[in-house]
């Protein structure tokens, strides 16, 4: 029987690649619901191609355009962030793919898990912001979470079938766009430079987060919540080739690693198909083309965001939510050429140093912390 999919953020990088998987396996998947933030043209085209039941545009200003573009079809059209969350909880889907970017992904994650859905999660911010709440809800509803992030998919695959305790998780890191750039030159980097990721093809925000290593810090937090591993047992290693996606070291000294070419369709396919694997077309990994795989420690002075994220995890509460909110504002400002690249982490530090803190947060506390962090970051950047 076909799996019925709701794809949240279908017009973004992960959403588009998820639909690539559907095209490769038309007998396995049925696209029921699609959502986008503003790109109504692509959303309409996707809804037509995959004969979706429902299309939702989060930005209500584009409702009319989407409705008109889908006139004459049977596609139901809705608008607004509440509608996105309602789609996530919809009763006629089996799997929710959360490919949204940022804090906006939290409410749909909560809605999907609350309805007991299988969640294929690319929106790491759901766990960065509200990991304790989200994992407790998933356990209560017995709703499985399958990570789409390549690093966490790799760890998940390494842990399948294992019952022994682990010594540590080893998350690999490409180093981002400025891996080989001296610290003294970081003050003058441009948006165009920051968007040139050396290995992965991703959306703009996550590519900037990769350049600051905010993304890697968030992945440490995500790994903690997904696998119940304390921050002291999570190691980040620089691995420029991006072939080893992550590793798990066990108590007996054995290490399992998951390898593959840098292609997000592999972890997406794994999340959708687990516990099976799909037969995928395309070029296979050639060991002869990669005779050398190298690893190194991360320069934490050059990339302070990694330690900031680890400290937020140690503090728990709303600390990571504050970091995320400030980062979202600062990255948008950088992409809009309203601040320097170095100002991104400075804005995060400013917000964390001034924000209020809730030790045992509710969903309402997360919302308040996000709003406060965004205000403080904007204050620092004079936006």
Positions of PLM-derived features:
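Catalytic, metal-anchored helix/loop core of enzyme active sites in primary metabolism
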Residues: 1-383
């Amino acid at each position: 029987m076909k799996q019925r999919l709701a794809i949240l953020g279908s017009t973004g990088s992960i959403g588009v690649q998820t639909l690539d998987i559907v095209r490769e396996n038309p007998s396995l998947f049925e696209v029921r619901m699609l959502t986008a933030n503003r790109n109504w043209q692509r959303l309409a085209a996707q809804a037509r191609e995959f004969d979706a039941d429902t299309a939702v545009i989060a930005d209500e200003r584009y409702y009319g355009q989407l409705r008109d573009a889908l006139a004459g079809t049977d596609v139901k059209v809705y608008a607004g962030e509440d509608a996105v969350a309602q789609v996530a909880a919809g009763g006629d889907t089996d799997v929710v793919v959360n490919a949204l970017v940022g804090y906006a992904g939290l409410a749909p994650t909560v809605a999907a898990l609350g309805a007991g859905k299988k969640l294929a999660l690319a929106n790491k911010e759901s766990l960065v912001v509200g990991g304790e709440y989200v994992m407790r809800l998933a356990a209560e509803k017995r709703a499985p979470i399958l990570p789409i992030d390549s690093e966490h998919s790799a760890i998940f695959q390494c842990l399948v079938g294992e019952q022994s305790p682990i010594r540590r998780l080893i998350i690999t890191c490409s180093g981002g766009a400025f891996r080989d750039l001296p610290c003294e030159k970081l003050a003058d980097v441009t948006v165009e430079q920051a968007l040139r990721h050396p290995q992965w093809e991703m959306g703009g925000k996550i590519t900037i987060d990769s350049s600051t290593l905010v993304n890697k810090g968030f992945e440490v937090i995500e790994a903690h919540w997904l696998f119940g591993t304390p921050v002291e047992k999570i190691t980040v290693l620089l691995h420029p080739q991006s072939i080893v996606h992550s590793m798990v070291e066990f108590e007996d000294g054995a290490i399992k690693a998951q390898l593959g070419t840098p292609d997000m369709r592999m972890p997406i396919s794994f999340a959708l198909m687990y516990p099976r694997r799909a037969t995928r077309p395309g070029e296979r990994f050639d060991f002869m083309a990669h005779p050398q795989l190298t690893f190194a420690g991360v320069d934490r002075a050059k990339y302070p965001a990694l330690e900031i994220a680890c400290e937020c995890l140690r503090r728990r509460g709303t600390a990571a939510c504050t970091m995320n909110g400030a980062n979202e504002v600062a990255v948008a400002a950088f992409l809009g050429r309203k601040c320097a690249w170095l100002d991104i982490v400075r804005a995060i530090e400013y917000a964390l140093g001034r924000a209020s803190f809730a030790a045992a947060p509710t969903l309402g506390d997360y919302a308040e912390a996000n709003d406060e962090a965004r205000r403080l970051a904007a204050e620092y950047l004079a936006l």
